[in-house]
C-alpha cells in the first residue's frame, strides 16, 4: 500500500504539485483568518461593556444629533445680592408649574459666594446629570463658575442682573438695619443701628467702606483668588470677558421689564409668560428696603472719588452698553418690526 502511494507521488506532474500547494495555502489562510476573528471578538467585548457603562453626558459628547435643546435647557442665574433678583425669581416660582420646568435654589454654607473644589465638581455633576430636573432654572448668590474646565458637553446658560454700585451699597446698608417688606418681621443683623449712610461715611465706619461695593466684579470674574482682591484691574478685565463670552444675557435692575422681555423672546421654553406676569402681578417690586434714605450730594461725590466705585461703575456701564446693544438688535432699523432671519440659496437642490 505504501509503495503504491509513493509511486503515485512520484508520478505527479509539476502542475499537480502546484495545485496541491495552492490548496494547502488556502486551507492554512482560512484557519488563520478564523483564529484572528475569534481573537478580535474577545478583544472587543470589554470595549462594548465600556460603551454600555458610559454616562449620558459621555454619550452626549460623542453624538449630539439627538440632543433636545428645549427639554435639556438649564439656565443658571448667579444672582448678585440687592439687584432685584428676588422679584425676578418669584416670577419663576409662580410659573414653573404651568411652564413645566424646575426652579432650584443654590444654598451655600454661611452665604459663601465661592465653592470649594470638591463642591465645584459635585455642583457641575448635579447640574449636568440631574436629568429629572431639566429643563431647570438654578439660582443663588454665587460667583461665576466656568463649566468648560470640567469637560462638560452642554454648559448651562448664564444670566444675571447688575445695579448701579452706589445704589446697591446703600440698599444693602439699610437692608441690614431695617429689612424689607418681603419679610418685615425678621430681625436683621444690624437692627437697632440708626446711623444713616451719610453719617457712616463721615465717621468712616466699616459698613459704608467702598470696599463693600466690590461684589459685582467678583461675581462675574469667578472663583479665582484675584477676583476677590478689591481694586484688581485683572479682575475687572476678566469680569468683562466673562460677561461677553459666558453670559447669554445680563440686564440692569433699572430696566427689569426689558430684561424679562428679552428672555421670554429668546428662551420661551422657560420664560413664557414672564412679561405679562411681571407687568400685571405684584412681583415687579417684591422686595423694597425699609427706611432707606438717599445719600447726600457730598456723600455721592466722596464715594465717586474712590477707585472701587470707579471700577464697579465701569463694569456697570459696560454691562449697560451690552444690554442696550442687545435691545437695539431685537428690532429692524425702522424700529417697528422685530428682526428676522431666513435661509436661502440652498445647494444642491
UniProtKB/Swiss-Prot annotation:
Residues of this chain annotated as glycosylated in UniProt: 107, 126, 282
Main subcellular location: Golgi
Sequence intervals crossing the membrane: 18-38
GO biological process: heparan sulfate proteoglycan biosynthetic process; open tracheal system development; signal transduction
Topology class, membrane: Single-pass type II membrane protein
Enzyme class: transferase
Keywords annotated in UniProt: Disulfide bond, Glycoprotein, Golgi apparatus, Membrane, Signal-anchor, Transferase, Transmembrane, Transmembrane helix
Compartments, as annotated in UniProt: Golgi apparatus membrane
Gene3D superfamilies attached to this UniProt entry: P-loop containing nucleotide triphosphate hydrolases
EC number(s) recorded for this UniProt protein: 2.8.2.-
Lumenal side: 39-349
Quaternary structure, from the entry: Homotrimer.
Protein name: Heparin sulfate O-sulfotransferase
Organism: Drosophila melanogaster
Gene symbol of the encoding locus: Hs2st
Amino acid at each position: 500500500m505504501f509503495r503504491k502511494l509513493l509511486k503515485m507521488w512520484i508520478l505527479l506532474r509539476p502542475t499537480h504539485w502546484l495545485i496541491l500547494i495552492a490548496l494547502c495555502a488556502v486551507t492554512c489562510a482560512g484557519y488563520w483568518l478564523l483564529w484572528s476573528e475569534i481573537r478580535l471578538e474577545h478583544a472587543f467585548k470589554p470595549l462594548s461593556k465600556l460603551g454600555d457603562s458610559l454616562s449620558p453626558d459621555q454619550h452626549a459628547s460623542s453624538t449630539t444629533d439627538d440632543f433636545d435643546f428645549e427639554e435639556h435647557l438649564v439656565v443658571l442665574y448667579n444672582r448678585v445680592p440687592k439687584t432685584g433678583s428676588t422679584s425676578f425669581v418669584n416670577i419663576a416660582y409662580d410659573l414653573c408649574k404651568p411652564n413645566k420646568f424646575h426652579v432650584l435654589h443654590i444654598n451655600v454654607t454661611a452665604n459663601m459666594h465661592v465653592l470649594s473644589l470638591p463642591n465645584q465638581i459635585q455642583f457641575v455633576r448635579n447640574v449636568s446629570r440631574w436629568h429629572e430636573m431639566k429643563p431647570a432654572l438654578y439660582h443663588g448668590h454665587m460667583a461665576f463658575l466656568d463649566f468648560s474646565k470640567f469637560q462638560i458637553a452642554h454648559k448651562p446658560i448664564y444670566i444675571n442682573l447688575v445695579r448701579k454700585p452706589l445704589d446697591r451699597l446703600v440698599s444693602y446698608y439699610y437692608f441690614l438695619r431695617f429689612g424689607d417688606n418681603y419679610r418685615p418681621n425678621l430681625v436683621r443683623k444690624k437692627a437697632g443701628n440708626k446711623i444713616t449712610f451719610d453719617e457712616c461715611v463721615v465717621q468712616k465706619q466699616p459698613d459704608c467702606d467702598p470696599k463693600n461695593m466690590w461684589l459685582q466684579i467678583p461675581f462675574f470674574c469667578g472663583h479665582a483668588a484675584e477676583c476677590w482682591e478689591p481694586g484688581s484691574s485683572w479682575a475687572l478685565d476678566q469680569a468683562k470677558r466673562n460677561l461677553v463670552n459666558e453670559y447669554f444675557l445680563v440686564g440692569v435692575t433699572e430696566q427689569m421689564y426689558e430684561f424679562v422681555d428679552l428672555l421670554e423672546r429668546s428662551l420661551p421654553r422657560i420664560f413664557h409668560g414672564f412679561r405679562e406676569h411681571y407687568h400685571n402681578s405684584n412681583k415687579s417690586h417684591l422686595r423694597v428696603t425699609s427706611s432707606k434714605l438717599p445719600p447726600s450730594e457730598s456723600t455721592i461725590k466722596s464715594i465717586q472719588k474712590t477707585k472701587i466705585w470707579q471700577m464697579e461703575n465701569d463694569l456697570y456701564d459696560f454691562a449697560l452698553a451690552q444690554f442696550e446693544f442687545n435691545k437695539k438688535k431685537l428690532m429692524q432699523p425702522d424700529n417697528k418690526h422685530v428682526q428676522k432671519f431666513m435661509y436661502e440659496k440652498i445647494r444642491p437642490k
